[in-house]
Design a protein with these regions (language model features):
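Alpha-helix N-cap/helix-start positions at coil->helix boundaries
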Residues: 11-12, 27, 42-43, 74-75, ...
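Long, ordered, amphipathic alpha-helical scaffolds
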Residues: 169, 174-181, 185-216
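Alpha-helical adaptor scaffolds
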Residues: 137-164, 169
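Amphipathic alpha-helical scaffolding segments comprising HEAT/armadillo-like alpha-solenoid repeats
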Residues: 1-6, 24-38, 57-70, 89-101, ...
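N-terminal alpha-helical scaffold/docking segments in eukaryotic complex subunits
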Residues: 1-55, 204-211
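Alpha-solenoid HEAT/ARM repeat scaffold
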Residues: 12-19, 31, 46-47, 63, ...
Length: 216
């Protein structure tokens, strides 16, 4: 990689050159990005992965994104996850699932978020188990968010039962919203209890669900 600069000006850094490649059309730019993704410096590799994700034809280098999910640098891995999420790259599914067991909390959190964009129904038990068992609040909340976004009729009641007793008010609110969308009137007694919740948002969501279900 090279970049001409005016006489007396500081030459651009490698990071700057890599970032500019994301805006350049043509095979030469893609080849340069592919080479940059293999550089020794982890932050230069991360910059290359990010640039590939932003390049109009970056998907031609999707094999490099898949490889980056196994990179020894957590920074590179997380950036690759972000590209997978942006592209909704289903080919990366199993590699992202494997990252749910990564020692890094930040990487696990990013992997959960990414999995939500390439979700398959079989992911529900895995992410629900993380929601139940993780001791880090950030991980539990990320898992809960993905579960809420991906809820459907097959497992909404499992989520409702867990969310409606969660200490986080937002999750209790989600329980009410799930009931409103998927439930039948037999769940009204539980919603009645939630309508007296200490949190105003939960009470409002519970009353709305009660009104919706009562009209069915």
């Amino acid at each position: 990689m090279s970049c001409n600069s005016p006489s007396g000006a500081h030459p651009p850094t490698t990071h700057q050159v890599i970032r500019k490649l994301a805006l350049q059309e043509g095979a030469a730019a893609l080849k340069a990005l592919a080479n940059a993704a293999g550089l020794e410096d982890q932050f230069e590799r991360r910059a290359a992965i990010d640039a590939i994700g932003r390049h109009p034809h970056g998907r031609e280098l999707r094999s490099i994104i898949l490889r980056a999910l196994r990179d020894p640098s957590e920074y590179v891995v997380r950036t690759a996850c972000e590209v997978v999420a942006q592209w909704e790259l289903q080919e990366a599914h199993e590699l992202v699932v494997a990252l749910l067991a990564n020692p890094s909390k930040a990487t696990r959190q990013t992997a959960i978020r990414t999995l939500g964009t390439i979700w398959v129904d079989a992911d529900f038990p895995t992410v629900f188990r993380i929601y139940n068992d993780a001791w880090e609040n950030e991980i539990r909340r990320e898992a809960a968010w993905v579960l809420r976004q991906r809820a459907h009729s097959a497992h909404w009641r499992t989520l409702f039962d867990a969310f409606q007793v969660d200490e986080l008010a937002r999750h209790r609110q989600w329980a009410c919203e799930l009931a409103e969308k998927f439930s039948v009137p037999d769940i009204l007694p539980v919603l009645s209890q939630l309508s007296s919740d200490v949190d105003g948002h939960v009470r409002k969501a519970a009353w709305r669900a009660i009104q919706t279900l009562s009209s069915r």
